[in-house]
């Protein structure tokens, strides 16, 4: 993080704090240790705006702190995938131009294809394998939880993240839209 800008470091701090607050106070529990997690929509917004490094650390630090404050201990096998989701979505930073007021239907499709793939890899593969390797959890249980998390987070980011990005893009002036009178 030697060349990381102050703006990115501040974004990581704010994003991780929002991740913790939303994760602790707005979870929709489905079954044991598995919730619909609205904080991933905010992480997606920050990841697109500030890039993969910010996205990774927002998810990693935010999830770690959320687990610590929740009192059930840090589940590292799920902390890492939260970071990977931000890393993957953050890879779209230079491709999407939401900071310039542009978020077209093609951009929405690209965003949602990438986030769906990243969620599937992170939650349906990485998290369950981590649970098995680190915690010796039963495979059928963790792959069920992982698949649910992948679909729930894809749905959450697909709706919430897309709406946040549309709102953000609409709040930015488009290039060439301002003229001197």
Curated annotation (Swiss-Prot):
This is UPF0397 protein SUB0313. The chain crosses the membrane at residues 11-31, 45-65, 69-89, 114-134, 147-167. Its main location: membrane. It is a multi-pass membrane protein. The keyword Transmembrane helix applies. It holds the Pfam family ECF-ribofla_trS. It is found in: Cell membrane. It comes from the Bacteria. Belongs to the UPF0397 family. The lineage of its organism: Bacteria, Bacillati, Bacillota, Bacilli, Lactobacillales. InterPro entries: ECF_substrate-spec-like, UPF0397. Keywords: Cell membrane, Membrane, Transmembrane, Transmembrane helix. The keyword Transmembrane applies. Disulfide bonds: none annotated. It comes from Streptococcus uberis (strain ATCC BAA-854 / 0140J). GO terms for cellular component: plasma membrane.
